[in-house]
Amino acid sequence: MNKQDPKRSNEPPVWLMFSAGGTISAICFPVLILILGILLPLGLIPMDNIIVFAHTWLGKLVILAVTIFPMWAGMHRVHHGLHDLKIHLPASGWLFYGLSTLYSIVVLFAVIAL
């Protein structure tokens, strides 16, 4: 028999942020490592181009995506990793997802001020 008033879960939005973070990490981080870790130090890409791109709306959107979503993925992994290890922190969901939310807000304001 079905319950008349099922309990709502916060898992779908959290899994959305987790999967977006994992996907963005897998796609963007190798490119960022190549550009910022190899090409820029070797002088093959001028720093001015990166600064100009970072000040455009698309650049700000990229900065937001590569900073916010991977944080959600990491915190989700830590939260569930601790659960798998039988380490149960009180209100761990509030702790990890709250820190991710706070981080997202701080990054949003920092990028807007850029």
UniProtKB/Swiss-Prot annotation:
Q: Which NCBIfam families match?
A: PRK05470.1-1
Entry protein name = Fumarate reductase subunit D
Entry keyword Ligase:
no
Keywords from the named record: Cell inner membrane, Cell membrane, Membrane, Transmembrane, Transmembrane helix
Q: Which gene encodes it?
A: frdD
GO cellular component terms?
fumarate reductase complex; plasma membrane
* Subunit field text: Part of an enzyme complex containing four subunits: a flavoprotein (FrdA), an iron-sulfur protein (FrdB), and two hydrophobic anchor proteins (FrdC and FrdD).
According to its UniProt entry, this protein's organism is Haemophilus ducreyi (strain 35000HP / ATCC 700724)
| Molecular-function annotations in GO | succinate dehydrogenase activity
